[in-house]
Swiss-Prot record:
Name of protein: N-(5'-phosphoribosyl)anthranilate isomerase
Family indicated by similarity: Belongs to the TrpF family.
UniProt-listed Enzyme Commission number(s): 5.3.1.24
GO MF annotation terms: phosphoribosylanthranilate isomerase activity
Catalytic activity annotation: N-(5-phospho-beta-D-ribosyl)anthranilate = 1-(2-carboxyphenylamino)-1-deoxy-D-ribulose 5-phosphate
Source organism of this protein record: Bacillus cereus (strain ZK / E33L)
Xref: PANTHER family: N-(5'-PHOSPHORIBOSYL)ANTHRANILATE ISOMERASE (PTHR42894:SF1)
Keywords: Amino-acid biosynthesis, Aromatic amino acid biosynthesis, Isomerase, Tryptophan biosynthesis
Gene3D superfamilies: Aldolase class I
Length: 204
């Protein structure tokens, strides 16, 4: 099971997450309490192992801005949380992830229409896109077609207490956590370590 730690804002957390076995780190460039500047993201990314995915999170940003930040920071993928369509995805020409809030099984069917490398299934958006600590009914994704499952990333309120059930129900390619590894709104490296251990153990 691949694990993504999202909402990285400092070097120490990024390095520790990689040491503990994170496969991907997310850097939020959209409005969020976890927003990071491109300059700081670049500094962190330059110090990370080559095999770790560096994912930039954007919401309804212009193609030009996304391309510029991707190139300057050394991102490997972009995660799109707004109303982006396949026309914009093709124009970007960057490995991409489309995030979709899940409220019914039809959201899973809609996901198959996106021309992205991965689909991130999240809880429906609130004030900010993603990172709100809320789960959704994983049963809605239980009967996902194999070709979609192979590129599915599960997010939304995951933590060490529910990750086993989430993986067993959805069987995604990757799981994504942000608020579930925080204490008082800050990333907690011990929680990151335990989450990664649990996710990788329960998927063996």
């Amino acid at each position: 099971m691949k694990v993504k730690i999202c909402g990285i804002t400092d070097m120490e957390t990024a390095k520790r997450a990689c040491e503990y076995g994170a496969d991907a780190l997310g850097f939020v460039f959209a409005e969020s309490k976890r927003k990071i500047t491109p300059g700081l993201a670049k500094e962190i990314i330059q110090e990370l192992p080559a095999n770790v995915l560096k994912i930039g999170v954007f919401v309804n940003e212009s193609v030009e801005v996304i391309q510029k930040i991707t190139e300057n920071c050394g991102l490997t993928h972009v995660q799109l949380h707004g109303g982006e369509d396949n026309h914009q995805i093709r124009r970007l020409n960057i490995p991409s992830i489309k995030s979709l809030g899940v409220t019914s099984e039809s959201d899973m069917k809609n996901a198959q229409g996106y021309e992205t490398d991965y689909i991130l299934f999240d809880s429906p958006k609130e004030k900010f896109h993603g990172g709100n600590g809320k789960t959704f009914s994983w049963e809605l994704l239980a009967h996902m077609p194999k070709e979609l499952r192979e590129k599915a990333i599960l997010a939304g309120g995951l933590n060490t207490l529910n990750i086993e059930e989430a993986i067993r129900t959805v069987r995604p390619y990757m799981v994504d956590v942000s608020s579930g590894v925080e204490t008082e709104g800050k990333k907690d490296v011990e929680k990151i370590k335990q989450f990664i251990i649990k996710a990788k153990e329960c998927s063996k």
